[in-house]
A protein has these predicted regions:
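A short, aromatic/hydrophobic, helix- or strand-capping loop or linear motif
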Residues: 234-238, 418
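Short Cys/His-rich micro-motifs in 6-15 aa windows
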Residues: 243
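Alpha-helical transmembrane bundle of multi-pass membrane proteins
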Residues: 1-218, 224, 247-480
Length: 480
């Protein structure tokens, strides 16, 4: 397929009031990403004090951490279908209330069971936001800036994680000797939940979703608020043509043809699952969830680890900012394949340093910290933003939220498994064995991405959809 065919038929994007309004919508919607980041990152510093107060062993720690990820898998899968039925905006408003009450449950949890319940509620909201917010942004964005606009959500995710690390360090070092200090760490996340709820009440629905459910006038009205009038009318017409082509395909599908229709969905779904699960297999959340444990294993004291843990969070934000600048300049495939190759390289360096540097070497924790920061920087620059953008772009409109939900489900399930297993693995084989394992897996994923990942940069969602359905978008078609 031609990546430029849509560019040649649509009027120029232009700038003005509509561009500023689109930016405001993106800012409000990405509060879901901020909550996603804070709620996944807060456990990093809260785990040690809550373990002491509630008498948690390593198994309980794994369940408190992993319960969010497993619930997020369910949230991602369920909210894809919910947003298809009720709309992206309505679903995000509902998620904001779950964020709020999940945080309150954690704040007032008297025991591990209630804490896991609160973390499960937060997980449902985190997973739902991870599936719905990127789709909402992708459906609002013009193709020229879709990567950078959709990628802002991941910037807010890592911004939320950094905020959690800073809050953890401040509260932990100033009031760490007091009971219940971890409750204040959780209490902070009620504030952006309120902001998301209030903000989304003033945000319009996705015009693509409105068209899919037959609300053309509303869709055109929304599109005119975020595009010039000429561009809005042209985009609406293009979306309608694609929907009509889909309807024709469905009506004509029978016998062998219906198997072919199912075949294109299975193929792109397998790619989406690879993208979603692969991100987690980088081992990034071994640092974002268990950074304090990893840094203590490297040789830092608990108070020093709380402060040192801010460094990976900071580089994650800087890497995401750089990634947003690269998204419209570098092909998605290049970003992803480079990302998995570079993370594998730093995995090997971390494992080597851990094995070769003796535990009593004063430089050991600092060398490992630098290598961990390099790993996080490479991953966040090349993979984190691009992963969520790609998953939001891959699927045709009528299965977009469901496909995104299943892809995110695979990622969150892998996240949950690693969250449960990592403390045990770290205790059994240390940093060396853990990161050698990650390195081997990431080399394999890089090869799979090279063979199977489509290129979606610089192409409208409707053009991607046509390429997915006729197979021309894949590397094997000779386009890349």
């Amino acid at each position: 397929m031609s990546a430029q065919s849509t560019a040649s038929t649509l009027p120029p994007l232009g700038t003005g009031k509509h561009s500023r309004y689109l930016g405001i919508i993106a800012l409000i919607a990405t509060f879901g990403g901020l909550l996603f980041g804070y709620d996944t990152g807060v456990i990093n510093g809260a785990l040690e004090p809550m373990s002491r107060e509630l008498g948690m062993d390593s198994t309980a720690q794994g369940w408190v951490t992993g319960s969010l990820a497993f619930a997020a898998a369910i949230g991602a899968l369920g909210c894809g279908r919910i947003s298809d039925r009720f709309g992206r905006r309505t679903t995000i408003i509902g998620l904001s209330t779950i964020f709020f009450f999940g945080a309150l449950a954690c704040v007032f949890a008297p025991n591990v069971a209630v804490l896991i319940t609160g973390r499960t509620l937060l997980g449902l909201a985190v997973g739902g936001a991870s599936a719905v917010v990127p789709v909402f942004l992708a459906e609002l964005a013009p193709y020229e800036i879709r990567g950078s606009l959709s990628g802002r959500n991941e910037l807010m995710v890592v911004g939320g994680q950094l905020a959690a690390f800073i809050v953890n360090a401040l509260i932990g070092n100033l009031w760490g000797e007091h009971d219940g200090v971890w409750r204040w760490m959780f209490a902070i996340c009620t504030l952006p939940a309120i902001g998301l709820f209030v903000g989304m009440l003033r945000v319009p629905e996705s015009p693509r979703w409105l068209l899919r459910v037959g609300k053309r006038e509303q869709a055109l009205e929304v599109m005119k608020r975020i595009r010039s009038t000429e561009r809005a009318e042209a985009e609406i017409a293009d979306i309608e043509r694609t929907l009509q082509a889909e309807a024709t395909t469905q009506n004509n599908a029978a016998g062998k043809e219906s198997v072919g229709v199912r075949g294109w969905f299975v193929r792109i779904l397998l790619v989406g699952i690879l993208v979603g699960a692969g991100q987690q297999l980088t081992g990034i959340n071994s640092i974002m969830y268990y950074g304090i444990k990893v840094l203590k294993e490297a040789g830092f004291s608990e108070s020093a680890a709380l402060i040192a843990n801010i460094a990976p969070g900071t580089i994650a934000v800087l890497g995401s900012i750089l990634s947003l600048r690269l998204m419209e300049r570098v092909p998605r495939r290049v970003m992803v394949i480079t990302g998995y190759s570079s993370t594998a390289f730093f995995h090997v360096l971390i494992a080597g340093a851990s094995m070769l540097l003796p535990a009593d070497n004063a430089a050991r924790p600092w060398i490992l910290l630098v290598l961990i920061v390099c790993f996080v920087g490479a991953m966040q620059t090349c993979l984190n933003v691009s992963t969520w953008v790609i998953m939001s772009e891959l699927f045709p409109l009528r299965v977009r939220a469901a496909g995104m939900g299943i892809s995110a489900f695979s990622g969150w399930m892998m996240n949950g498994v690693l969250s449960l297993a990592f403390p045990v693995i770290l205790g059994a084989v240390g940093l060396t064995g853990s990161f050698i394992g990650f390195a081997v897996v990431n080399v394999i994923i890089a090869l799979l991405m090279f063979r199977n990942l489509p290129e979606t940069r610089g192409v409208s969602l409707e053009q991607v959809e046509r390429g997915v359905m006729d197979g021309s978008i894949y590397p094997s078609a000779g386009k890349h």
